[in-house]
Amino acid sequence: MSLHRLSVAAAAALLSATALSASTLAQSFNDKKPISYSVDGATATGYFKVVAETINSIVREAYPGSDATYKPGSPAGGILNISNGKSEFTFTGGGPEIEFALEGKAPFKESLKGKFSFMMMMHDELVVHALMTKEFSDRAGVRSYDDIVAKKPAMRLGVNTTGNLQSTYGMYLLHFGAYGIGDAELAKWGVTLFRGNTNEGLSQMRDGKIDMLVNGAFLPTAEVIDINRGRPLVWVEGNEQRMKSAVGKYGYKVVKLEKGGYPFVERDTFMTVNWNAGLVGNHVSEETVYKFLKAITDAKDKVQKVHPSLAKFSKEAIVRNPTSLPLHPGALRFYREAGVMK
């Protein structure tokens, strides 16, 4: 046999072996062998615990014997823990947390770039509620952010805790930041900040302890409707162009809130909508991520029933990556094989 024919034969054999190896590798993930992971980054009770535990049960059913656990924490803490190998996944990744983690800004002590990756979009449905008591609105003569910035009324403003970056930098600081206004300027007006999670803020509004609340909730939220019955509310109207200029850095949406979205929304206005991402530590194996995504997308009907925010859950929806993070290799392989990305 000539040297040329030997080279061709060798190349063909190598290609065949490579294809066989790739095929064998791909098939090795389509089994029932258990996987092990922990989910970090959310509170001990509430929405994300319910979501995580439901997803974990789906994974255990798909891969009997899997060790899928839930660890209460915080969004920033979740990113830190998946980056240092203490946990595998977090479902509460937000734009500000990711930004601060990559840049090494407090509460992160160093950049975590290269230590965690994007896995999936959890949802794109968290509405930033800008609520004000009607009594204060009438007294101060303000109904919109434009009005507030123009008149600068002293008020009691309910916002989230400093440790929750996505619900501060991604909410009230984002809205006021569209006008170049931060905490220092608000303080000069005589604005007093009352900090707490959404439920605490709603309780303060119900009790008349705050005049305005800017925090995240899904639409509609039953407690907001209930508060309005005893303490009439107004929705603080947003300026579409200013909001769009502010949300771009995080890939958030500005959408129309139609008249009647809540009983007290008297005309169409605009609101910002935030997403949460499923993130994964780079120490996690390709197999674990691939099998995790396969299990939950195969059972998408179950996931969609967990909460209205997940009603659109599908492999086509969760592949959207609004961050600067790379896809984890296991996620990249899954989405390619699922036909939702090239």
Give residue spans per PLM region:
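Bacterial N-terminal signal peptides that target proteins for export
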Residues: 1-11
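Bacterial N-terminal signal peptides
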Residues: 9-21
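Bilobed "Venus flytrap"/periplasmic-binding protein-like clamshell domains
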Residues: 34-62, 66-72, 128-207, 301-304, ...
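Pocket-flanking alpha-helical
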Residues: 53-58, 69-112, 199-205, 213, ...
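A structural signal for short loop-to-beta-strand junctions that line the ligand-binding cleft
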Residues: 109-129, 261-270
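Periplasmic solute-binding protein
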Residues: 122-138, 271-279
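An extracytoplasmic/periplasmic, membrane-proximal ligand-sensing/linker region
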Residues: 199, 207-208, 212, 217-230, ...
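C-terminal lobe and pocket-closing loops
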Residues: 234-291, 326-327, 334, 338
